[in-house]
Amino acid sequence: MDEQEIREEVALAERRATLYWWFASMLCRELDSDQLNTLCSESGRVLLDALAEEPSLAPGCQKLRRALAGVQVLATPQLELAADYATAFLGDHLGSAPPYASVYVEPGGMMFQHPHQQMVQWLQQWQLAVSFDGNEPADHFAIMLDLMGNLVLKGVDSPEAQSAQSALLAEMLPPMRRWVTQCQRQPGFYAALAELLLAFVSLDQTLIEGEFSLAQ
């Protein structure tokens, strides 16, 4: 691999990691005023336009744009979104869609199942601390996305981190698909965000599996 190819690989990894961290920041807690203003600004539009250039992400981007347009006409958009966040994610699995992988791996929606234990192990292995408010289970999708962003950057020069990306996606995607389906029971911003997230993660899995198979 020549110097130009290395620079391109690093730049791609930085873009992927940034997107994983962006989605994590959207999910980890209610949006603050700065996040909402940025999302509704020119930079937010540019981000969604760039994502929409990928055909598999275009429908999700369009839904998120429509949801944002609806939010912007509200009298108190940040407060309304905070209420939507609570309704969407903070109830039990019967009435909302808690963003924890464990809830979707076994009937009954139990917390602290295998995905949580696996994430604790991975976070320790990669010496990463959870920077969340409160005492979140380690399999919160935002924590899993944050870890993925770190593995993407480490994977530029670490075959072990490349393999870890595939393992994390295999752990995360099946429960995420069920979670996204459950999110659609509460239409609006977070349902649209979840749908776009799933499209992005699914696309990334396809891309890295193709890259790793070619490298073998």
From Swiss-Prot:
InterPro entries: Chaperone_TorD (IPR023069), DMSO/NO3_reduct_chaperone (IPR020945), HscB_C_sf (IPR036386), TorD-like_sf (IPR036411), TorD/DmsD_chaperones (IPR050289). The keyword Cytoplasm applies. It is found in: Cytoplasm. Its main location: cytoplasm. Belongs to the TorD/DmsD family. TorD subfamily. This is Chaperone protein TorD. Involved in the biogenesis of TorA. Acts on TorA before the insertion of the molybdenum cofactor and, as a result, probably favors a conformation of the apoenzyme that is competent for acquiring the cofactor. One of its GO terms (biological process) is protein folding. It holds the Pfam family Nitrate_red_del. Keywords: Chaperone, Cytoplasm. GO terms for cellular component: cytoplasm.
